[in-house]
Design a protein with these regions (language model features):
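Flexible, low-complexity junctional segments that flank or bridge functional domains
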Residues: 1-179
Length: 179
C-alpha cells in the first residue's frame, strides 16, 4: 500500500511531484504536523532528529514499503501523548490557581516552534490545563444560570429538555477526559 501510494504521488499526481529530498522533507513535515499540530508534544531536538534520520529519504522509503520511520515517529507520539495525559491527571489532583495575572496562553501554535526543553513543554501544558479549567468553570456557571432561568420561567424553554447536564466539577470533567 505504501509503495502504491508513493508511486502515485511520484508519477501520477496532478502536480507531477517527484519524491526527491525536498518533497520527502515536506511529506515528513506534514506527517509531524498531522500528529502534533500545536507543536506541543514533540521537542525541537526530536523533530530535528527525525528530519536528519528520515527526511531526505522519506519518499524513497515509502516507495520501497519501508515504514520504519513513520512507525518510530508514531511510537514516540503515542508515548508522549501518554506522558501528556499522565501529567494532566497528576496536575488535576493538585490545587490550581485560576486567578493568575499576566499569564498568556498561545492557543494557535501551528506556526510556533517546537519546545526546546521539557520544562518549556510542561509550562505550556500547565497553561493549557488552567485555561481548560477556567473555560469549564465559566461554562458551568453559564449553564447553572440558564437552568435557573428556565426553572423560574418554563415558557422560556420552548420545548427544550429542562434536565441539566451531568453535574461534574471542572476537575472531574477533565479527569474524565484524560482517562
Amino acid at each position: 500500500m505504501a509503495r502504491q501510494l508513493a508511486t502515485l504521488v511520484d508519477r501520477q499526481h496532478y502536480l507531477n511531484l517527484r519524491l526527491d529530498a525536498t518533497t520527502s522533507n515536506r511529506i515528513l513535515d506534514m506527517y509531524l504536523d498531522s500528529l502534533d499540530p500545536d507543536h506541543s508534544l514533540f521537542l525541537a531536538s526530536e523533530v530535528e532528529e527525525y528530519k536528519n534520520k528520515y527526511g531526505a529519504n522519506f519518499g524513497v522509503a515509502l516507495k520501497t514499503g519501508n515504514l520504519a520511520g513513520p512507525f518510530a515517529i508514531h511510537a514516540q507520539y503515542r508515548e508522549r501523548l501518554k506522558q501528556f495525559y499522565e501529567y494532566m491527571l497528576a496536575e488535576l489532583k493538585k490545587p490550581q490557581n485560576l486567578q493568575q495575572k499576566d499569564a498568556y496562553l498561545e492557543v494557535d501554535r501551528e506556526k510556533s516552534a517546537y519546545f526546546k526543553t521539557t520544562t518549556e513543554q510542561k509550562a505550556q501544558w500547565q497553561k493549557m490545563l488552567v485555561s481548560q479549567l477556567i473555560n469549564l468553570t465559566i461554562a458551568k456557571e453559564e449553564e447553572l444560570a440558564k437552568q435557573k432561568a428556565l426553572k423560574a420561567n418554563p415558557s422560556l424553554a420552548n420545548g427544550q429538555d429542562l434536565t441539566g447536564p451531568e453535574d461534574l466539577t471542572p476537575v472531574q470533567t477533565l479527569t474524565k477526559r484524560y482517562t
